[in-house]
């Protein structure tokens, strides 16, 4: 059985770019999305890895996460986890309702916690590996208008730091990338040209992620790396 790179949140624009980038390097990828099979994952057969596994799971459900990882265990030893699950909604502290707050914390932070916990339990026994989480520029510079989202992403960064410290004795690296605005079809549809002027293509971020989970990045752990360009 070959080493796997697990990509959670693989159906989104960034997820598809990451899966395609890894597949382009002929790596074995377990692409996880909420609903599977997803025909959008690596649509070009020329970029298909030797083994591309399409898996489905509700990553906000701890029991379903454990079921997912039991399935992954049958596919091979995990070399790296790329955790891209998340979502955005605006709102100030004073006008964010309970449902929106809980949804953003669950989608951005809780999913990351459960998936990282399952991965860490396995990687710590291997003596090698990598975990890559996705934070946000707003986690460092929380401006007005995205309160719950910024708090959730700040939690992702702190979780990344804690895991990096906990897994250091096992030589498992844990890092995060910090996007700003990503140039995706959804953002193009909802944002004006001015807001998109400095947007970064998902393919560019995918190349950074691919490097960070590779053995070439072995000296890097506990880092929060900006990938928002000049925007």
Q: What are the roles of these predicted feature ranges?
A:
Residues 121, 164-169, 218:
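Alpha-helical segment proximal to the catalytic Tyr-Lys
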Residues 84-90:
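Conserved NAD(P)H cofactor-binding loop of Rossmann-fold oxidoreductase domains
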Residues 116, 152:
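Active-site helix of classical SDR
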Residues 92-93, 100-105:
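Substrate-binding pocket helix/loop in short-chain dehydrogenase/reductase
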Residues 203-227:
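C-terminal substrate-recognition "lid" of short-chain dehydrogenase/reductases
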Residues 136:
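Residue(s) in the substrate-gating loop at a strand-loop-helix junction
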Residues 11, 19:
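N-terminal Rossmann NAD(P)H-binding glycine-rich loop of SDR-like oxidoreductase domains
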């Amino acid at each position: 059985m070959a080493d796997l790179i697990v990509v959670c949140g693989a159906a989104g624009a960034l997820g598809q770019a990451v899966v395609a980038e890894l597949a382009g390097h002929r790596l074995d990828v377990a692409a996880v999305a909420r609903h599977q099979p997803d025909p959008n994952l690596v649509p070009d057969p020329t970029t298909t890895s030797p083994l591309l596994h399409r898996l489905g799971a509700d990553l906000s459900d701890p029991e379903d996460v454990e079921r997912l990882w039991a399935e992954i265990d049958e596919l091979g030893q995990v070399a790296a986890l790329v955790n891209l699950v998340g979502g955005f909604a605006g709102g100030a502290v004073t006008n964010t309702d309970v449902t929106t707050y809980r949804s953003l914390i669950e989608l951005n932070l809780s999913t990351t916690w459960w998936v990282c916990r399952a991965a860490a339990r396995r990687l710590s026994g291997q003596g090698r590996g990598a975990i890559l989480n996705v934070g946000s520029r707003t986690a460092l510079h929380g401006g007005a208008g995205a309160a719950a989202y910024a708090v959730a992403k700040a939690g992702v960064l702190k979780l990344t730091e804690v895991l990096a410290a906990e897994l250091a004795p096992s030589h498992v690296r844990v890092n995060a990338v910090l996007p700003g605005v990503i140039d995706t079809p959804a953002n193009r549809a909802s944002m004006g040209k001015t807001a998109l002027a400095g947007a970064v293509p998902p393919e560019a971020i995918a190349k950074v992620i691919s490097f960070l989970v590779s053995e070439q990045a072995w000296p890097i752990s506990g880092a929060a790396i900006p990938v928002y360009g000049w925007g």
